[in-house]
A protein has these predicted regions:
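Short coil/turn connectors at secondary-structure junctions
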Residues: 1, 38-44, 70-73, 100-105, ...
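Active-site mouth loops of central-metabolism enzymes
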Residues: 47-59, 114-125, 193
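Residue-level marker for buried hydrophobic side chains located in beta-strands
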Residues: 45-47, 107, 241, 441-444
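Divalent-metal coordination cores built from histidine and acidic residues
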Residues: 64-171, 472-474
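Histidine/acidic residue-rich metal-binding segments in metalloenzymes
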Residues: 124-144, 150-215, 222-241, 252-266, ...
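Active-site beta-loop-alpha junctions enriched in small/polar residues
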Residues: 52, 56, 80-82, 108-115, ...
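Active-site microenvironment of metallo-dependent hydrolases
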Residues: 1-24, 32, 68-70, 252-268, ...
Length: 544
């Protein structure tokens, strides 16, 4: 029997009890109060209610090493990034790798692969695939349902996916940015139980009124805590915390779910409500096998120095200490010798500079970037002189943006984007939600072609090209992940970001923001297979 002492935070009874926890075979057998004084606190481990581990560019094992040190004990992972590239093979890779992680990783089945009929991904996940996957017992629900028109119009394939999950009485996550009114009612009635895309309080309250749970998101690209934080006091039982997408640099320096907990406590919200949102609410909603510091449950908890900064001293998972502040985690890469050539799909040939030409007349439509958001604006600009090839207009902060299918040799789609700040060079990425084709932004065609071709020749990664000088992070797993450890990746990532900032880019997370510029299921203007796509009308401008 193991005994752990400290100030035990009882969220259910809203009490802090000095005492000890008895653990046997990974289960809490008793909790005793002893009246002693302790300088540390025992709390339930944090739960991320919606995350795409692939967005960290790390495997589940390496991801777990970064978040456990922040008190995270479990995450609900939607593997739709790797599924868009490799389908069921990619999903199985994530599940198998997660078995060796330090935390509990639960999986939902990707619902929309590809995201829409307008996307071109490497693979499909059909209703038949979902039926096969759900029978495996490896999944706790259906991932974010992005095909809103499919639900509203009762598309047979979409509705069959939903019915398969409802048959098992499992939760279905939502993805409904700006959805309101009658369309929202139909969406909820289909069985959608959560949404993590709310950007305004009014939107969140309407969804709560219809029975949805709201996931307050604070990731590397989308940050909605400030807009939604009053829900912590008004609806503490209807909200959860999530990160959605975070890069390793932020996980190391800013934290994970703990950063929202610290912020909420600092903002004066009730400690027990905040901890409930970060721990108990996702456990109950998703039916997770995660302990919450009660007798008879698994011994899953964190020991923190205080209830202000929440510095993590140690973390226990099923009674075993998986992290200790004084013992460095093993960051050795155990998988470098693995042949992961079958874990990628890259059929694209390099492009020529001449393929990037685009003529413009006086007025152009631009994607308007908002730093800290993944939504964009539809903006109009006037160009003084018509051009047979407008590479950029730096005075107006207008750059060329290129979308290139990596699964087949189609012509590049070219448009313009405003709000990046870059004044020289170009950068590109094969992380491009959700189909993970190549997307690039640049000031001139020569550097654009260089950045794009660097990714093609290496079959995935992040690249910067400045007058021919290349900086690069290789991502050999599906063109979106690496087997390298989080510290190594964070160092390269930080170097790339510093370089982009030195080149004039003022976005806080340039690659993360760029990766969402092809996600056409997020408002308002994005770029895809046929050029610019307008979300509110759900069509390509070229189709008008």
């Amino acid at each position: 029997m193991k005994k752990i002492e400290g100030n035990i935070v009882d969220i259910y009874r809203k009490k802090i009890i000095p005492g000890f926890i008895s653990i046997e075979n990974g289960i809490i057998t008793s909790i005793f109060q002893n009246g002693k004084k302790y300088d540390h606190y025992i709390i339930p481990g944090f739960v991320d209610s919606h995350v795409h581990i692939e967005s960290s560019m790390l495997t589940p094992v390496e991801f777990s090493k970064l978040v456990i040190r922040r008190g995270t004990i479990a995450v609900i992972n939607d593997p739709h990034e790797i599924a868009n590239v490799l389908g069921k093979k990619g999903i199985r890779f994530m599940i198998e790798n997660a078995k060796d992680s330090l935390i509990k990783i639960f999986f939902t089945i990707p619902s929309c692969v590809p995201s829409t009929i307008y996307d071109f991904s490497g693979e499909f996940v059909t209703s038949d695939d979902i039926g096969e996957l759900i029978e495996s017992g490896d999944f706790i629900g259906l991932s974010e349902m992005m095909n809103i028109p499919g639900i509203i119009c009762n598309d047979p394939e979409v509705m069959q996916k939903i019915e398969m999950i409802r048959k098992y009485n499992l939760p279905i996550d939502g993805h409904a940015p700006s959805l309101r009114g009658e369309d929202l009612r139909k969406y909820v009635e289909a069985g959608i139980s959560t949404d993590h895309e709310c950007t305004t309080l009014e939107e969140a309250l309407e969804k709560i009124s219809l029975g949805m749970k709201i996931l307050i998101r604070e990731g590397s690209a989308a940050k909605n805590y400030e807009s939604l934080k009053s829900l912590i006091i008004s609806h503490p039982d209807q909200v959860m915390f999530c990160t959605d997408d975070s890069h390793p640099g932020d996980l190391l320096s800013l934290g994970h779910i703990d950063k929202m907990v610290k912020r909420a406590v600092a903002d004066g919200f009730d400690l027990f409500d905040v901890l409930k949102i970060a721990t108990i609410n996702p456990v109950l909603h998703y039916g997770l096998k995660v302990g919450t510091l009660r007798k008879g449950e698994t011994a899953d908890f964190a020991i923190v120095k205080d209830l202000v900064d929440f510095e993590v001293l140690s973390v226990f998972v099923e009674g075993k200490e998986r992290y200790n502040l004084n013992s460095e985690l093993n960051s050795d890469n155990q998988m470098l010798s693995i042949d992961y050539s079958d874990l990628n799909k890259f059929e694209r040939e390099p492009i020529l500079v001449s393929e990037l030409k685009k003529s413009v007349e006086k007025d152009i439509i631009c994607i308007g970037v908002i730093d800290g958001e993944i939504v964009t604006k539809k903006e109009y600009f006037s160009i003084q002189n018509p051009s047979i090839n407008l590479e950029s207009d730096l005075e107006q902060d207008i750059l060329k943006i290129v979308y290139l299918n990596r699964y087949r040799n189609t012509k590049p789609q070219i448009a313009y984007i405003h709000g990046i700040g870059l004044n020289k060079g170009a950068f590109a990425t094969s992380i491009s939600h959700d189909s993970h084709n190549i997307i690039a932004v640049g000031c001139n065609d020569q550097d654009l072609a260089c950045a794009i071709n660097t990714i093609i020749l290496n079959k995935g990664g992040l690249s910067i090209c400045d007058s021919g000088e290349i900086s690069f992070l290789s991502l050999p797993i599906g063109g979106i992940m690496t087997f390298s450890n989080g510290i190594e990746v964070a160092q390269i990532w930080d170097h790339l970001i510093e370089k982009l900032h030195a080149m004039g880019c003022y976005l806080s997370s340039p690659f993360m923001t760029l990766s969402f510029m092809a996600l056409i299921v997020i408002p308002e203007l994005k770029i895809g297979e046929k050029g610019l796509f307008e979300y509110s009308k759900f069509h390509f401008l070229s189709d008008i």
